[in-house]
Amino acid sequence: MEKIKLGVICGGMSTENEVSVVSASYVLSNLNKEKYEIYPVYIDKNGQWWEILDEFKPRKFGEEITKKEKIKNEFKYLKNLDVIFPVLHGLYGEDGTIQGLFELLQIPYVGCHVLASSVGMDKVYAKVVFEKAGINQTKSVYVRKYNDKYVYIDEHFNEEILSDIDVAKKVQTRIDFPMFVKPSNSGSSVGVKKAENERELVEAINYAAQFDKKVLIEQGIIGREVECAVLGNEDVIASSVGEIKAADEFYSYDAKYNNQESRTEIPANLPKDIIEEIRKQAVKAFKAIDGSGLSRVDFFVENGTNKIYLNEINTLPGFTSISMYPKLFEQAGIKYEDLLDKLIELAL
């Protein structure tokens, strides 16, 4: 049987370049070499494309790709492929940008298409879609950086230009402390800070605005962080539910990738009806953005009430050894290698 020419793309120009490389190293190590002719590609932080010549082995976080060859004509290189697995996280890889390129070149690819990727990446507009779908979410406020000030945007999208201090005061009229402040277009908790008072809120808004001009401020929920993986196109299945036991105050970038004390619990120790509702809401969120292939959907379960709040959807979740997406399906009996086969099959 003729092998499928599979491109695996990693790296990218986002702040999640290193995470993407680690994810891709595990994908490359687990692909069936009898089934696929593999073309591994690295995009560096400047946007240059390289063919990876290193051996396929799991990499540590921050480990550089040493053997690579510059790709002179990216379009010609891509047109040679049967299907692409973009193991890219963050801007220019998970936001519909590269998916649009694949669409123009008419090459099948793993994962969500342009619209779903774009909406899933933009936390502000994802909230608009999820609200329309009737999915419970935390209260939130959206502001936009404008020169040395901010545009405060109310629930009807009316705008008002204010200083950072005045924006912080305005935010407090709509939501209470603690708050979580995050860039609208960012992943892996990059740029996220918790604010317990007005001073911390001002600092957090200015910090998040370094990563994206759109900043989302959310009401903090005292509860548990849980995640559910989904797989499919029209016929979508949901995994079991896993819980994040973060070493830090919340599941920050450092807690995800550097702090060994962070751990996961699969399946989460929750009542059966809560687990089933989370699985149902995960599929609903995926379909609300017109998702395809895969996503990981993150929720909070409030202490005391067990009320479920959708946190966000991740249309191209991590594939490292500690990543929840493959671990959730492994618990359901789908091995890593078989999961990759299924994702590629869905793309084709």
Regions found by a protein language model. Name each.
Residues 45-47, 145-147, 185-187, 221-224, ...:
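Glycine-rich beta-alpha junction loops
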Residues 1-115, 119-125, 144-162, 166:
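ATP-binding N-terminal substructure of ATP-dependent carboxylate-amine bond-forming enzymes
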Residues 219, 228-230, 286-319, 329:
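Conserved metal-phosphate-binding beta-hairpin within the catalytic cores
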Residues 193-280, 304-309:
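Phosphate-binding site of ATP-dependent enzymes
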Residues 38, 108-109, 137, 179, ...:
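Hydrophobic beta-strand scaffold residues
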Residues 90, 189, 244-247, 314-328:
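Glycine-rich phosphate/pyrophosphate-binding beta-alpha loops
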